[in-house]
Curated annotation (Swiss-Prot):
The active site is at D303. Belongs to the metallo-dependent hydrolases superfamily. DHOase family. Class I DHOase subfamily. The keyword Zinc applies. InterPro entries: Amidohydro-rel (IPR006680), DHOase (IPR004722), DHOase/Allantoinase_Hydrolase (IPR050138), Dihydroorotase_CS (IPR002195), Metal-dep_hydrolase_composite (IPR011059), Metal_Hydrolase (IPR032466). GO terms for biological process: 'de novo' UMP biosynthetic process; purine nucleobase catabolic process. It comes from the Bacteria. Keywords: Hydrolase, Metal-binding, Pyrimidine biosynthesis, Zinc. The gene is pyrC. This is Dihydroorotase. Zn(2+) 2 binds at D150, H177, H230. PANTHER family: ALLANTOINASE. Binds 2 Zn(2+) ions per subunit. PROSITE patterns: DIHYDROOROTASE_1, DIHYDROOROTASE_2. Its cofactor is Zn(2+). It comes from Pediococcus pentosaceus (strain ATCC 25745 / CCUG 21536 / LMG 10740 / 183-1w).
Length: 425
């Protein structure tokens, strides 16, 4: 099967080039200014951006256990509609993938039900909430690509110390949800004047920064690859930057909502603005962008967390934490960062494809050269459109960005040479 993509602006080798791309079966076989061959499909890309498929190392597909919120089929549909060709799914499902048997079953289900490359996290501890460590070697052999207890922090230093020692031996990243539960105080948003004004319980910044400081010292001691999920505080960026300068093997991600939303935008008790970590201050938001631009934070990850309408109804006091993100990430980032000149589109592709693939050792992802697996995405960045809940492929419509006008709509997504999404019209 040959697919010829004509008249593309291709993002490769850190620059944009006007060229054609030929795909044969699952591989890129030619990248030339003008390719004239017979092919089963010839698609005129019409000068739109063609880039390596996007990579999201932090998503929640809720499958198994909460498939009323999302499942592998609907999550995959949302991912490819957002331009993603590889995602890593978190282990806060039921049953938790904490044994080789459960991991094997999840990997098989992801492969058969999904329409893109899906990597599976194993949990760090049994059932994710205990202090008993899993068998990391056995889970890796069963298909785990990394380990996390996302949704909960590791509450004791000894457990985290032993986890890092053992995970280092298997050579995979430990992705940490940094949260000291003793400092959460049943909060639902950032602790501060806005929470006080709204009469809502706040979450102290120490819930994140105190556990992060602990973990960075453990990572320094063990030499493990310690990855920080959804960084939300300026102080966290500072701690990570200092540890990196000292040679600690620490990497970090930031979510789009923490880059573009802050507590000052919460003018009422609005469950759509409830997420964990919470939306912080304007100064925190600016520091996160600074950390992204200077390389302290190496990637953007959505923390795609779909919920039912019922879960996100009522008050922030009772609604679930979380926001969908796979279908809105690229357009929001392109519109709010690239369009105003805060970064280049090449940098955005680094953060959303190349670097997450490199940092998590996803060897077939984030590539666009002859001989590479044909995981490709075409984006229309010229025409404005409105984010509408009716257009979501995800089961979750819990997004505060609905109604915003953006640029960067996915036109085509190809996974291993197969077109898995193509926008009608």
């Amino acid at each position: 099967m040959k697919v010829l993509l004509k008249n593309a602006r291709v993002i490769k080798s850190h620059q944009v080039q006007k060229t054609d791309v030929l795909v044969e079966n699952d591989r890129i076989t030619q990248i030339q200014p003008e390719i004239n061959v017979e092919a089963e499909q010839i698609i005129d890309v019409k000068n739109q951006l063609l880039m390596p498929g996007l990579v999201d190392i932090h998503v929640h597909f809720r499958d198994p256990g909460q498939t009323d919120k999302e499942d592998v089929v609907s999550g995959s549909a949302a991912a490819v509609k957002g331009g993603f060709t590889t995602v890593l799914t978190m282990p806060n499902v039921d049953p938790v993938p904490d044994t080789p048997e459960k991991m094997t079953a999840m990997v098989k289900h992801n492969q058969t039900a999904g329409s893109l490359h899906i990597g599976q996290y194993g949990s760090i501890t049994k059932k994710r909430t205990s202090e008993e460590l899993v068998d990391f070697k056995a889970l890796k052999e069963a298909g785990a690509v990394a380990f996390s207890n996302d949704g909960n922090g590791i509450q004791t230093a000894e457990t985290m110390y032993q986890a890092m020692l053992q995970i280092k031996e298997v050579g995979l990243p430990l992705a940490a949800h940094v949260e000291d539960e003793s400092l959460m105080q049943h909060g639902v948003m950032n602790q501060g004047t806005v929470a006080e004004k709204l009469g809502l319980p706040g979450i102290s910044e120490l819930a994140e920064t105190a556990q992060l400081a602990r973990d960075l010292e453990i990572a320094r001691n063990t030499g493990a690859h310690y990855h920080v999920c959804h960084v939300s505080k300026a102080r966290s960026v500072e701690l990570i930057r200092r540890a990196q300068r000292d040679g600690v093997h620490v990497t970090a991600e930031v979510a789009p909502h923490h880059l573009f939303l802050d507590e000052t935008m919460i003018s009422m008790d609005n469950p759509m603005m409830k997420m964990n970590p919470p939306l912080r201050t304007l100064e925190d938001r600016q520091a996160l962008l600074g950390g992204l631009l200077d390389g302290t934070i190496g990637m953007i990850a959505t923390d795609h967390a779909p919920h039912t309408v019922k879960d996100k109804a009522g008050s922030m006091k009772t609604a679930s934490f979380g926001i969908t993100g796979l279908e809105t990430a690229f357009p929001l980032l392109y519109t709010k960062l690239v369009k105003p000149g805060l970064c280049t589109v090449e940098q955005l592709v680094e953060w959303m494809s190349i670097q997450p693939a490199e940092i998590f050792n996803l060897k077939a992802a984030g590539q666009l050269e002859v001989g590479d697996v044909a995981d490709l995405t075409v984006m229309n960045v010229e025409d404005e459109y409105e984010i509408k809940e009716a257009d979501f492929a995800s089961k979750g419509i819990n997004s505060p960005f609905i109604g915003q006008k953006v640029y960067g709509q996915t036109q085509l997504t190809m996974v291993a040479g197969k077109i898995v999404y193509q926008r009608e019209g």
